[in-house]
C-alpha cells in the first residue's frame, strides 16, 4: 500500500519539462538521481555521451534510465475507456485513504499537545500565585465535597490548614531573609567597589614610592657629578702644573738676581776705587758754583729739594730690592752734592745700604709716628689701593697732599715765603712692587748690566762717595732719567772736559741700546689681556676727571709754553753730535743757573715746595702731586725728617715706563744734573714715543695758586689707561 502511495506521489511530483528539449515530457525517463527526460531526447544524448546531462552520472547498461509507469505517455490512448476509468478510481481511493490516515494522526497529536498545555498552565499558576492554587484546591475540594460529601473528613481539612499556615510562615521568613540578603548584597557591592579603589590607590602609591622608579635618574645625576669632579681635578692639576712652572721661573730669576747683585757689588767696589781720585779734584769747583748761583735759584723756586729721603728707602730684601737700592743711591747722590761734609755723608750712605731688613711701611710709621705735631691729617687725603696688573705699570704714581699745597697760593701771590709746618707721608696709589715685578725686570738688568757699569764712569760726579754707593742696574731707563735731569736745577759742580767727551760717546751708544731694548720688550698674552681689561675700565673715569681738572686748573696755561721750550730744545740734537766742545760749555752754563746755595741746603729743618713738570710730546698735560723727602744732619750723622716738598706733574708718556723707572729716575736724577738740555732733547728725539722730556719749572706761582684738587684728579692724571691709548 505504501509502495503504491510512493509511486503515485512520484508520478504526480515529476517535472513537466524535459532537461534536454525543455518541452513537455513525453514518455518520461528518469536517471538514478530522478532527473526526468524524454525518452527520445535521452536516446539521442546517449549516442554521443554516456553521462546524465543534468548531474553527469554515468549511464551504463548496469545503470540504465528507467521508464515511469502511469505517466503521461502516448500509449494511454491505446487503453480502453473502462480501463482508464478504473485506473482513475483506484488512484483516487488510494489518495483518499492516505489523506484520512494522515488526518487521524494529526488529531491525536493535537489532543496530546492540549493536555500538555493545560498541565504547564497549572504549574505556572501555582508558582506565581500560591493563594489561587490554594483557592483552586479548595474549590476542587468543594467540588469534590459536593460531589463526594461522604468521602471528606474534618481531620484532613485541619491537617491541610496547619500545613498551609506553616508554609505561609516559612514563606514570610524566606521573604524577609531574601530582603535582608539583598540589602547585605548591596552593602557588600559598595564595600567591594571601595576596596577595589583602595587597592588601585595603594598600587599607584607603591609604584610612586618604589626606589627603582628614580634609580636611573639618581645614577645619571651621580655620573654627572663624577664627571664634573673629574673635570675640576683636571683643571686643578693643570693649574698646579702652571704654578709649578711659574715658581721654577721665579726661582731661576731669583738666582739670576742674586748673581747679578753680587756682580754689581763687585763692579761698584771697582768703580769706587777708580773714581776716588776724580772726586777729590772736583770738590772745590762744585762749592764755587753753589755759592755763585744761590740767589737765582732762590728767586725762581720757592724752595729746592733733592730726591727721596734716605729713611724712606729701606724696604725689605724680599720686596723692592732693586727699587730700594735705586732710591738709597739717589738719596746719597743728592745729599752728597748739597752737603759740605763728604766723609760723614758717605758713612751714612753705607749704613743705609746695609739696612735692608725693615719694610718701608713699618719704617715710615716709626719715623713719622714720633712727630705728632708735624703729621697733621688732612681730610681730603685718601689712599686708593687700586688692583694692579702684573705689568711694569703697577706702580702708577706717588702722591703727597698737604694743606700747604692748597693754602700757599694766597701767600705766594703777595711775594711772601711761607714754610710748611705739615709733614705728610708718601701716598702710594699702586705700590704693588712685589717679587713678581722685580723678577720681570731682572732680565732687563742682566741685559744692560755691562753697559750700565761703563755708563757709571761717564755720568759720575767728581765726588767719589756718591757714585760709589750708586747701583748701575737702573741706567737702562735713561729715556726717563735724562729728561728728569733737565728740569731738576739743583746739581752742584762742573763737568771736566774729559768727562763731557766720555758722556757724549756713551750717550750715543746708550740711546741705541735703549731703543733696541724698548722694541724687543714683549709681554705675554695673559698680561696684555689683564692690562687691557684694567685700563679700559679706568679710562672712562680718567677721561671725565681729567677734563674737569684741565678746565679748572690754572696750571694748564703754563704747560703749553713749557712744552714749546722742550720741543725747541729737541731741534738742537744735531749740534750736540757735531760740536762736543759747545756741548760742554752749554752744559756748564745750565748747571750754573740751576745750582743751589749752601744756605738753602743747610736749612734742613724747613719744608720748601719745588715744582717739576713732565710734558708729553703730544702736549697733553696731566697733574700728579707727590713728595720725596730727604735730609741728613752732618753733625750727628742721624737721619732726620724730610726737608723738601716735591710737586711733580706726570704726563701720559711717563706712565708707560715700568714701575721701577719711577724710582730709578729719582736715583739717577742728581747724577744727570750735569747733562745739558740739548743732550736731553736729542735723546728724546731718538727715543721711542714712550719717552718724554722734562722742562724746568718757570711758573711756580701759577702752580702754587691752583685751587684745592681732588684725589680723583691725581688718579686720573696717573692712570695707565691714557698712557696706553696715547
Swiss-Prot record:
Keywords: Chromosome, Coiled coil, Metal-binding, Phosphoprotein, Transferase, Ubl conjugation, Ubl conjugation pathway, Zinc, Zinc-finger. Residues 276-334, 436-460, 570-602, 687-726 are annotated as: Disordered. Its main location: nucleus. GO terms for biological process: protein autoubiquitination; protein monoubiquitination; regulation of DNA replication. Its EC number is 2.3.2.27. The modification Phosphoserine is found at residues 210, 526, 553, 561, 568, 570, 719, 721. CDD domains: RING-HC_RNF219. Residues 87-129, 155-270 form a coiled coil. GO terms for molecular function: chromatin binding; ubiquitin-protein transferase activity; zinc ion binding. Residues 304-318, 713-726 have a biased composition (Low complexity). A zinc finger (RING-type) spans 18-56. Auto-ubiquitinated. Residues 319-334, 589-602 have a biased composition (Polar residues). PROSITE patterns: ZF_RING_2. Residues 280-290, 446-457, 579-588 have a biased composition (Basic and acidic residues). SUPFAM superfamilies: RING/U-box. The keyword Calcium does not apply. It holds the Pfam family zf-C3HC4_2. It is found in: Chromosome. GO terms for cellular component: chromatin. E3 ubiquitin ligase essential for DNA replication origin activation during S phase. Acts as a replication origin selector which selects the origins to be fired and catalyzes the multi-mono-ubiquitination of a subset of chromatin-bound ORC3 and ORC5 during S-phase. This is ORC ubiquitin ligase 1.
Amino acid at each position: 500500500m505504501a509502495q503504491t502511495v510512493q509511486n503515485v506521489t512520484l508520478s504526480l511530483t515529476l517535472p513537466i519539462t524535459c532537461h534536454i528539449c525543455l518541452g513537455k515530457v513525453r514518455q518520461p525517463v528518469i536517471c538514478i538521481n530522478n532527473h526526468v527526460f524524454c525518452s527520445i531526447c535521452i536516446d539521442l544524448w546517449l549516442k554521443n555521451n554516456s553521462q546524465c546531462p543534468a548531474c553527469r552520472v554515468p549511464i551504463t547498461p548496469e545503470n540504465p534510465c528507467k521508464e515511469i509507469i502511469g505517466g503521461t505517455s502516448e500509449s494511454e490512448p491505446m487503453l480502453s475507456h473502462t480501463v482508464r476509468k478504473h485506473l482513475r478510481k483506484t488512484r483516487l481511493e488510494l489518495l483518499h485513504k492516505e489523506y484520512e490516515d494522515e488526518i487521524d494522526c494529526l488529531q491525536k497529536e493535537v489532543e496530546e499537545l492540549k493536555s500538555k498545555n493545560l498541565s504547564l498552565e497549572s504549574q505556572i499558576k501555582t508558582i506565581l500565585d500560591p493563594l489561587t492554587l490554594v483557592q483552586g484546591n479548595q474549590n476542587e475540594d468543594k467540588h469534590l465535597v459536593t460531589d463526594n460529601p461522604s468521602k471528606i473528613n474534618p481531620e484532613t481539612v485541619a491537617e491541610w490548614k496547619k500545613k498551609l499556615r506553616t508554609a505561609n510562615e516559612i514563606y514570610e521568613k524566606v521573604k524577609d531573609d531574601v530582603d535582608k540578603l539583598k540589602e547585605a548584597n548591596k552593602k557588600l557591592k559598595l564595600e567591594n567597589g571601595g576596596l577595589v579603589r583602595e587597592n588601585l590607590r595603594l598600587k599607584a602609591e607603591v609604584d610612586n614610592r618604589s626606589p627603582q622608579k628614580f634609580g636611573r635618574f639618581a645614577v645619571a645625576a651621580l655620573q654627572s657629578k663624577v664627571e664634573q669632579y673629574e673635570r675640576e681635578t683636571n683643571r686643578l692639576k693643570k693649574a698646579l702644573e702652571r704654578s709649578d712652572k711659574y715658581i721654577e721661573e721665579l726661582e731661576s730669576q731669583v738666582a739670576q738676581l742674586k748673581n747679578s747683585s753680587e756682580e754689581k757689588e763687585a763692579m761698584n767696589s771697582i768703580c769706587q776705587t777708580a773714581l776716588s781720585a776724580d772726586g777729590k779734584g772736583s770738590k772745590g769747583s762744585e762749592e764755587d758754583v753753589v755759592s755763585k748761583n744761590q740767589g737765582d735759584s732762590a728767586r725762581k723756586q720757592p724752595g729746592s729739594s733733592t730726591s727721596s729721603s734716605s729713611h724712606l728707602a729701606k724696604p725689605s730684601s724680599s720686596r723692592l730690592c732693586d727699587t730700594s737700592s735705586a732710591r738709597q743711591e739717589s738719596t746719597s747722590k743728592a745729599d752728597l752734592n748739597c752737603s759740605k761734609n763728604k766723609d760723614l755723608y758717605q758713612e751714612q750712605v753705607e749704613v743705609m745700604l746695609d739696612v735692608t731688613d725693615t719694610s718701608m711701611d713699618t719704617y715710615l710709621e716709626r719715623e713719622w709716628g714720633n712727630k705728632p705735631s708735624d703729621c697733621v691729617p688732612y681730610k681730603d687725603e685718601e689712599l686708593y689701593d687700586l688692583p694692579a696688573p702684573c705689568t711694569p705699570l703697577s706702580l702708577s704714581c706717588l702722591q703727597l697732599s698737604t694743606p700747604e699745597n692748597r693754602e700757599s697760593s694766597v701767600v705766594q701771590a703777595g711775594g711772601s715765603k711761607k714754610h710748611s709746618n705739615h709733614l705728610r707721608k708718601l701716598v702710594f696709589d699702586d705700590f704693588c712692587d712685589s717679587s713678581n715685578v722685580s723678577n720681570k725686570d731682572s732680565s732687563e738688568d742682566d741685559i744692560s748690566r755691562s753697559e750700565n757699569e761703563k755708563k757709571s764712569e761717564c755720568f759720575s760726579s767728581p765726588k767719589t762717595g756718591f757714585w760709589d754707593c750708586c747701583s748701575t742696574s737702573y741706567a737702562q731707563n735713561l729715556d726717563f732719567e735724562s729728561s728728569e735731569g733737565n728740569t731738576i736745577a739743583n746739581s752742584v759742580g762742573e763737568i771736566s772736559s774729559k768727562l763731557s767727551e766720555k758722556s757724549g760717546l756713551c750717550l750715543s751708544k746708550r740711546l741705541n741700546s735703549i731703543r733696541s731694548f724698548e722694541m724687543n720688550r714683549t709681554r705675554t698674552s695673559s698680561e696684555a689681556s689683564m692690562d687691557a681689561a684694567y685700563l679700559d675700565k679706568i679710562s672712562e673715569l680718567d677721561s671725565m676727571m681729567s677734563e674737569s681738572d684741565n678746565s679748572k686748573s690754572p696750571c694748564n696755561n703754563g704747560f703749553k709754553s713749557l712744552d714749546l721750550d722742550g720741543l725747541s730744545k729737541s731741534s738742537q740734537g744735531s749740534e750736540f753730535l757735531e760740536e762736543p766742545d759747545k756741548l760742554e760749555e752749554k752744559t756748564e752754563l745750565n748747571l750754573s743757573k740751576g745750582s743751589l746755595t749752601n744756605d738753602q741746603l743747610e736749612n734742613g729743618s724747613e719744608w720748601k715746595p719745588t715744582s717739576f713738570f713732565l710734558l708729553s710730546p703730544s702736549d697733553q698735560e696731566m697733574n700728579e702731586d707727590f713728595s720725596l723727602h730727604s735730609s741728613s744732619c752732618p753733625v750727628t750723622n742721624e737721619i732726620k725728617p724730610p726737608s723738601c716738598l716735591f710737586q711733580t706733574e706726570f704726563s701720559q708718556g711717563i706712565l708707560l715706563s715700568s714701575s721701577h723707572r719711577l724710582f730709578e729716575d729719582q736715583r739717577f736724577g742728581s747724577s744727570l744734573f750735569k747733562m745739558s738740555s740739548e743732550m736731553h732733547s736729542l735723546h728724546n728725539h731718538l727715543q721711542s714715543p714712550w719717552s718724554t722730556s722734562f722742562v724746568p719749572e718757570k711758573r711756580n706761582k701759577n702752580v702754587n695758586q691752583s685751587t684745592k684738587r681732588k684725589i680723583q684728579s691725581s688718579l686720573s692724571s696717573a692712570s695707565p689707561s691714557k698712557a696706553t691709548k696715547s
